[in-house]
């Protein structure tokens, strides 16, 4: 494991940096309800080594009573803003270092099943009163949050707009066996591309093209460790399985813990390899991981293509352009000469006003919502596939489809779930013309909201204009907290990074800014691959507040706000240090 990787015991680099030096009130590495004195816990070899130094005395566990926690402000007891009780009062938890591993512990403690992806900031509002915990760090196996590390009661550097929110799948333990469950471990439902050496399969996902990555070696199936796991690696897996482009590379056993051997670690794909086994790694069976680090993928196509699944008007050439190595979407390498050209003229469509895409980086990428009886509602991802996305994109006036998403990829909707088991041929004018169970008939929750990735009018216009037609640019949506934009560049995919927060636009300081942050931002904005991450106001100094500093990304985060950073508005910069990115335009 190289210097840039996180220690396998579960600490993040940020946490390790914080521990070398004086600690506020002592670093808590676990506590038990009812304890009053310091009770040392078993220490790993790495932590024992640190105890040889004088400063390490600050790392001794400080037992803290932790009788209760709750989720408030959400639609159910299993979804909301996290609060813990201390000394008779309820308080918030700060989101520094918070991830799905920590959320899984909370969900398990509450009897709420599996944690879903970490929601956007302020998803359930801001808390009031004290902030009790910060830098919570769980390994994933803990029975309760009280066994995880933290900085200690009341020690933090946060504000309430950093309050942790948690989404659990409360249906996990009550669903019938036939209903899809995120943690399904049955290999019988897994998609795999063969039984030969180097074959891969996805296990534990809600559809055949999502799940924990397992690979076959020496006749034995094993998992892949998430050290260095990223979107290029996921792209190879999705392509090997015929599942289109990669939407996300998941870490920290997002799709549940595997069993048996860990066969690959530090996988590094260039993105063009035909098989995962062709990528660089430490070698078969060489790793320093546990199954809490099992890698996974989410691919754009929910089900793999078959020779009989293509609608009459879709040629194999069209399908290959959307699912082959050159297909362009989130995280794929762009290829202008193969994407959209053959379908642009007949796929642009006219907006019906009865379907919209929301929650995404542009008006043509997002959660699918349909209008019925005067109200908007969502579509469940049961049977949702590329043909359905084609119709949704056409009805939205957004050109050809690039991919179909599920599992609430673009956030969780509100209100009714209006359609389920949608089955389109791909030629319908409206989504409501496709087969479905009937308006309002479903067995879903909003964690199953379907989405679509469309080429969009901007990109479509490049192709349509070549054919002698005209196109109209869609107006930009009104910004909301957390929205990002690139300013002063020559096109929409390069420029100075600006963030919208509290009804104002502000900039990002270039301290610690690097290509990994650019990768996250380019992906979030629906642009191509990150080319550079210049600092020093490369595109000129901005105005207004400097909202973020010391942004540190791994590169696989879904949004820039999930990267580690100093708390809002705290920095030591001026606008001569504004951060920028250059992304390859699509």
From Swiss-Prot:
Disulfide bonds join 94-158, 107-168, 138-148, 225-289, 238-299, 269-279, 380-444, 393-454, 424-434, 509-573, 522-583, 553-563. Residues 1-58 form the signal peptide. Residues 69-169, 200-300, 355-455, 484-584 form the SRCR domain. It is found in: Secreted. Its main location: secreted. Residues 1-33 are annotated as: Disordered. Keywords: Disulfide bond, Repeat, Secreted, Signal. PROSITE patterns: SRCR_1, SRCR_2. It comes from the Eukaryota. InterPro entries: SRCR, SRCR-like_dom_sf. PANTHER family: SCAVENGER RECEPTOR CYSTEINE-RICH TYPE 1 PROTEIN M130-LIKE, SRCR DOMAIN-CONTAINING PROTEIN. This is Scavenger receptor cysteine-rich domain-containing group B protein. It comes from Mus musculus (Mouse). The gene is Ssc4d.
